[in-house]
Each structure stands twice: as C-alpha cells, then as structure tokens.
From Swiss-Prot:
NCBIfam families with a match to the protein in the record: PRK11875.1 (NF008825)
Domain of life, source organism: Bacteria
InterPro entries: PSII_PsbT, PSII_PsbT_sf
Keywords, ordered alphabetically: Membrane, Photosynthesis, Photosystem II, Thylakoid, Transmembrane, Transmembrane helix
Entry's localization field: Cellular thylakoid membrane
Described function: Found at the monomer-monomer interface of the photosystem II (PS II) dimer, plays a role in assembly and dimerization of PSII. PSII is a light-driven water plastoquinone oxidoreductase, using light energy to abstract electrons from H(2)O, generating a proton gradient subsequently used for ATP formation.
Encoding gene, per UniProt annotation: psbT
Name this protein carries in UniProt: Photosystem II reaction center protein T
C-alpha cells in the first residue's frame, strides 16, 4: 500500500509541474 501512495504522490508532483509549465508558457505541446 505504501508503494501505491508513493506513486500517487509522485504522479501528482509531475502533473503539478507539467500544468505549471503549460499554463506559464504558451502551450506548445499538442500542436
């Protein structure tokens, strides 16, 4: 169960970084 929580926190951190960069700069990913 600890590994699941660790992966969840890690994914959340990566998602936060991704959204911070995506919203700060013009979205170049996808187009």
């Amino acid at each position: 169960m600890e590994s699941f929580a660790y992966v969840l926190i890690l994914t959340l951190a990566i998602a936060t970084l991704f959204f911070a960069i995506a919203f700060r700069d013009p979205p170049k990913i996808g187009k």
